[in-house]
């Protein structure tokens, strides 16, 4: 699936990923390929991005906002204050504050 994370200042992430976990208003939930279409409000918390296992990450290009998860270097995390998620046709867009 394709993921794009956008803030008011910049595009923070734009790439193919294996999965994404987000802090929904009623708890964290995860999306994989072919997830049903959804629009959801996000609360403060961590967005967890599961990158492709064969994908080589260059963290210098990520402006220091996305950091590797402490237990798994194939998971990137991004702290958000709030946001909105739209998922449709294997494309997720996160509008993050």
Map each language-model feature to its residues:
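Compact, glycine-rich, soluble single-domain proteins
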Residues: 2-97
